[in-house]
Regions:
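Mature catalytic domains of secreted/periplasmic carbohydrate-active enzymes
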Residues: 62-64, 75-76, 82-84, 94, ...
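Acidic (Asp/Glu)-rich catalytic clusters
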Residues: 52-57, 73-92, 108-119, 143-154, ...
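Active-site beta-loop-alpha junctions enriched in small/polar residues
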Residues: 38-40, 66-70, 97-100, 127-129, ...
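Accessory recognition modules or surfaces
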Residues: 29-34, 40-41, 63, 73-86, ...
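Histidine-acidic metal/acid-base catalytic patches
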Residues: 4-16, 22-34, 40-58, 172-193, ...
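Active-site acidic/histidine proton-transfer and metal-coordination neighborhood
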Residues: 10-11, 17, 21, 62, ...
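Active-site mouth loops of central-metabolism enzymes
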Residues: 34-46, 96-103, 135
Length: 283
């Protein structure tokens, strides 16, 4: 995972809301703290059940996974993993899937597995550099994402795309992220905004919520080190003020959010705990 810049004015008409899949329009609310398990990538593959026990003890209730592959995750059957998560009082509500997975039978199987285990969102989190050399490259990817979203819609799952920084580096005097917002059909693809990377690029998430209301259905929450903007801080100790951001959740369209740390001031598991403690004080 990596990231960077954008801005543009757009309106989100009421007719657009009416065209959304009913499962999204209904909008089940988040039931507790969320965590993207990539935060614990150094340990979860070695001891998934032990790590999940600690995560549950911190008060997390909703999890976003990564690394699913052909019915397996972290060395376990995906169904077994989800059952264990539920036994700890948590749920897998979202997952990250590689761009190379969204075509063909592998995608349908992933969607079927997600559906069977009660997952609500499936997200593509990254575009490899060789695949994004031009605006035309982005447009082609958006076409693929729209098709993947159609498959998800048929199973009652919401499909999304997660931003990094590179989408905001201009190509041909255009900002790729703006292009994506135009090319992606909202009925098929929602956005998972990584708050950190928007701020890292020098932009204000609140402005994007105002310019594209209803488009940012999931968030990643991580704070920015006050001395080095490319490093994470435990949420609540860095440069980002999350109170006004959460206050704008309805305008943004947010349904789910997840703490995600890519770098740490200490041990990853300690960061997961510290972030949970802070977020409990403001939510």
């Amino acid at each position: 995972m990596k990231r960077r810049e954008f801005v543009q004015t757009a309106s989100f008409a009421a007719v657009g809301l009416l065209s959304l899949p009913s499962f999204l329009a209904a909008g089940k609310g988040q039931k507790g703290l969320g965590l993207q398990l990539y935060t614990l990538r150094d340990t979860i593959g070695k001891d998934p059940k032990g790590v999940l026990q600690k995560v549950a003890s911190f008060g997390y209730k909703e999890l976003e996974t990564y690394s699913y592959n052909n019915g397996q995750i972290f060395g376990l059957e995906f169904a077994e993993f989800c059952k264990y998560v539920k036994g700890l009082g948590m749920n897998v509500t979202s997952g990250h899937y590689g761009l190379n997975m969204i075509k063909g039978d592998t995608w349908q199987k992933a969607v079927d597995d997600a559906k069977k285990n009660g997952q609500e969102f499936m997200v593509v989190p990254y575009i490899n550099e060789p695949e994004r050399k031009s605006i035309d490259d982005y447009k082609k990817i958006c076409a693929d994402l729209n098709k993947a979203g159609e498959v998800c819609n048929k199973s009652g799952i919401r499909f999304g795309y997660h931003n990094h920084a590179f989408e905001f580096d201009k190509l041909d005097d255009q900002i790729p992220f703006d292009v994506m917002l135009k090319e992606l059909e909202h009925k098929n693809v929602g956005m998972e905004m990584d708050i950190f990377w928007v701020v890292n690029a020098g932009y204000d998430p609140l402005k994007y919520f105002a310019q594209y209301p209803g488009r940012f259905e999931q968030w990643h929450i991580k704070d920015m080190d006050k001395e080095d903007k490319n490093r994470n801080a435990n949420v609540g100790t860095g440069a980002i003020d999350f109170k006004p951001i959460f206050a704008a959740a309805k305008k943004s369209g947010m349904k789910r959010w997840y703490v995600e740390q890519e770098t740490y001031p200490g041990q990853p598991i300690d960061s997961a705990e510290a972030c949970a403690k802070y977020l409990k004080t403001i939510l």
